[in-house]
UniProtKB/Swiss-Prot annotation:
Gene: tuf1
UniProt record similarity statement: Belongs to the TRAFAC class translation factor GTPase superfamily. Classic translation factor GTPase family. EF-Tu/EF-1A subfamily.
Subunit details: Monomer.
Top-level EC class as recorded in UniProt: hydrolase
Residues involved in GTP binding: 19-26, 81-85, 136-139
Described purpose of this protein according to its UniProt entry: GTP hydrolase that promotes the GTP-dependent binding of aminoacyl-tRNA to the A-site of ribosomes during protein biosynthesis.
Entry protein name: Elongation factor Tu
Region (G2): 60-64
EC number: 3.6.5.3
Region feature (G4): 136-139
Length: 394
């Protein structure tokens, strides 16, 4: 089968369905692909194709995730759907499937349920920037007042977690009826697609963000100076520009005097490229793996942050026993491990393998970080958990 050429003409946006079990996330995913394929072209995906989600590994954690793609006239979407609640938790925390926006599915027959709340909270913690609500199964509710009530509850819940509950689009539909080809419900899927286009802003591309390169290796080249190597995470570095070396030690300024890739000299290094950057006036021993090279002032070193963490179960190769408040594992950021201590939420005495939990982490060395940075929790090089920086404290 020949691969279709990927058309780069339209903006690309990553979305996903979230919400309580059996509220119709997967049916909606199937309905979106089917109705949009019928309306705008593209290929439909059946419910069972999406439901049999393949296993993936992200940061050593196995996650079942389905990826589908669809197009509106304005955009190309990559959409992620997970079969089980645990898969959502893992997916959102590891950032395996980053979402520029999420479709929160709430069954009109049930209203918001515990996982509805948990997914909204997770979305807030891990930095899902926009939510759109699809009220599903509206064909099964005759009472207009009941629909109003459910909508109000969902909006209040979103506002509780700092989403703009009053402004978020709420579409009342029926994924199943749309999938079965009933025109009035198909129209609701088109309405949803319209909101995906208009309500979720086009994401900023990695190349347009401020320059950052996690340092993997440091060499000294006689007569030329010190070279650091790594993959540019975002932005562009040009020869002659000032850069900062951030993390672990005090922040130091330098100038990029050369960029090379595969032994060839370039005038810049761009997001996604593996490059060597030559630094002026820096000694080999002043710099180490785990620091980052960044645009001056764009990122700061921190030691303390609030995080959302998933602890691997025994079956996933994680711990066999719970841990308690004196726990001191390593936190692996980008290219290096840093030891840290943890503070558990009030009333939580221990954390079991397979749990997800909010915790405050204090590191023994500062690391360059922003909200949304992902990390692994390790014990002697073995991954036992995954986390995301929800909020930098100090």
């Amino acid at each position: 089968m020949s691969k279709e050429k990927f058309e780069r003409t339209k903006p690309h946006v990553n979305v996903g369905t979230i919400g309580h079990v059996d509220h119709g996330k997967t049916t909606l995913t199937a309905a979106i692909t089917t109705v949009l394929a019928k309306t705008y072209g593209g290929s439909a995906r059946a419910f069972d194709q999406i439901d049999n989600a393949p296993e993936e590994k992200a940061r050593g954690i196995t996650i079942n995730t389905s990826h589908v793609e669809y197009d509106t006239p304005a955009r190309h979407y990559a959409h992620v759907d997970c079969p089980g609640h645990a898969d959502y938790v893992k997916n959102m925390i590891t950032g395996a499937a980053q979402m520029d926006g999420a479709i929160l599915v709430v069954a009109a027959t049930d209203g918001p349920m515990p996982q509805t709340r948990e997914h909204i909270l997770l979305g807030r913690q891990v930095g899902v920037p926009f939510m759109i609500v699809f009220m599903n199964k509206c064909d099964m509710v005759d009472d207009e007042e009941l629909l109003e009530l459910v909508e109000m509850e969902v909006r209040e819940l979103l506002s509780q977690y700092d989403f703009p509950g009053d402004d978020i689009p709420v579409i009342r539909g029926s994924a199943l009826k749309a999938l079965e080809g009933e025109a009035e419900w198909e129209a609701k899927i088109i309405e949803l697609a319209g909101y995906l286009d208009s309500y979720i802003p086009e994401p900023e591309r990695a190349i347009d963000k401020p320059f950052l390169l996690p340092i993997e290796d440091v060499f000294s080249i006689s007569g030329r100076g010190t070279v650091v190597t790594g993959r540019v995470e975002r932005g562009i570095v040009k020869v002659g520009e000032e850069v900062e070396i951030v993390g672990i030690k005090d922040t130091v300024k330098s100038t990029c005097t050369g960029v090379e890739m595969f032994r060839k000299l370039l005038d810049e290094g761009r997001a996604g490229e593996n490059v060597g950057v030559l630094l002026r006036g820096i000694k080999r021993e002043e710099i180490e793996r785990g620091q980052v090279l960044a645009k001056p002032g764009s990122i700061k070193p921190h030691t303390q942050f609030e995080s959302e963490v998933y602890i691997l179960s025994k079956d996933e190769g994680g711990r066999h026993t719970p841990f308690f408040k004196g726990y001191r594992p390593q936190f692996y950021f980008r290219t290096t491990d840093v030891t840290g201590t943890i503070e558990l939420p009030e009333g939580v005495e221990m954390v079991m393998p397979g749990d997800n939990i909010k915790m405050v982490v204090t590191l023994i060395h500062p690391i360059a970080m922003d909200d949304g940075l992902r990390f692994a929790i390790r014990e002697g090089g073995r991954t036992v958990g995954a986390g995301v920086v929800a909020k930098v404290i100090a």
